[in-house]
Each structure stands twice: as C-alpha cells, then as structure tokens.
C-alpha cells in the first residue's frame, strides 16, 4: 500500500510539474505575441489648465511674429507621414525632447515671462513620457524627426524662432497623439 501511495504521489508531482512547465511555456509564447506596454499616454488634465494653455499659446504667438520664414512648417502633415496612429505619441515625445533640449533651454533667457512658465510645463510632460517606447520599427519616426532637426539647424536662429513659434502646434499635437 505504501509503495502504491508513493507511486501515485510521484505520478501526481510529475503531472503537476509538467502542467506548470506547459503553463510557463504558453505564457512566454503569449508574451512574445503581445506588444510591450509603452506607457505613451498623458492625462487630459495636463491640457485643461487654462493658465498654462494661455501662456503656451501666448508664447507661440509672440515669437511667431518674429518668424520671417512662413513657407516652412516644422509640425504639420509631413511630420506624421508614414507613422501609424498608435506610434504618434512616441513621435511627439521625440519632437518634444528635441524642442526642449535644443531650442527652449538655449533660448530660456528670452521671451519672458512666458518662457519661465512654459519650459517647466513641457519638461513635466517630457518626464511623464520618459517610459514611452515602441516595440516595433521606428524607422519612419526617426527619419521624420531627423528631417525636423535638420530643418531647424539649417535655418539657424530662424529655425529656433520657428520651433518656439509653433509651440501651440506642439501642444495640440501632443494632446491629440497622447491623450
């Protein structure tokens, strides 16, 4: 009887172990098929604060008056070309980070008082998107962002003015893509 009980116990343990391995294998296989959680989302409340919305749009309006190059748009249809809707927030994260690091921070002593309020707000959005990544091919995104960066660099200070003058478009595009 004891031998039969031991035999059943080993058989049961073997079945249990095999079942666990099967479950782990199925879980791992399913995990490969699921997209990685990208955390590419912003809360709508970020875009519903009248004061900062007003300051952002006022900064863009003030600076756009100094923009002499009205033939070029940095944020528009071309920027989103070839980028699926689900990846547009990641694209806008890249544009936001470039705008902050290469345009706004070097120009932060200008266009006061708006700049001192808008830069921390946009930095907060950038921090909220810090874990935003895509798991697929980002070739079109990188190409479009590279084109935007090259345009700003080619235009020099005029390109920086244009980027600041389009902060309203950046704001709206972030809201549309990330909320």
Curated annotation (Swiss-Prot):
Residues 1-33 form the signal peptide. Glycans are attached at residues 54, 68, 97. It comes from the Eukaryota. Pfam families: IL22. Keywords: Cytokine, Disulfide bond, Glycoprotein, Secreted, Signal. PROSITE patterns: INTERLEUKIN_10 (PS00520). Disulfide bonds join 40-132, 89-178. It is found in: Secreted. The keyword Cytoplasm does not apply. GO terms for cellular component: extracellular space. GO terms for molecular function: cytokine activity. InterPro entries: 4_helix_cytokine-like_core (IPR009079), IL-10_CS (IPR020423), IL-22 (IPR020453). The keyword Nucleotidyltransferase does not apply. Belongs to the IL-10 family. PANTHER family: INTERLEUKIN-22. Cytokine that contributes to the inflammatory response in vivo. This is Interleukin-22b.
């Amino acid at each position: 009887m004891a031998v039969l009980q031991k035999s059943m116990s080993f058989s049961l343990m073997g079945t249990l172990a095999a079942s666990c391995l099967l479950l782990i294998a199925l879980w791992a296989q399913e995990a490969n098929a699921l997209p990685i959680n990208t955390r590419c989302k912003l809360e709508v409340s970020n875009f519903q604060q009248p004061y900062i919305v007003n300051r952002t749009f006022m900064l863009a309006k003030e600076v756009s008056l100094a923009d002499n190059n009205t033939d070029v748009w940095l944020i528009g249809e071309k920027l989103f070309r070839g980028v699926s809707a689900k990846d547009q927030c990641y694209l806008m994260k890249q544009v936001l980070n470039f705008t902050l690091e290469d345009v706004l921070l070097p120009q932060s002593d200008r266009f006061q008082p708006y700049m001192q309020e808008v830069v921390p707000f946009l930095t907060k959005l950038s921090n909220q998107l810090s874990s935003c990544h895509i798991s697929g091919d980002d070739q079109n995104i990188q190409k479009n962002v590279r084109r935007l960066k090259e345009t700003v660099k080619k235009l020099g200070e005029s390109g920086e003015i244009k980027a600041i003058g389009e902060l309203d478009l950046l704001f709206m595009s972030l809201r549309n893509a990330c909320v």
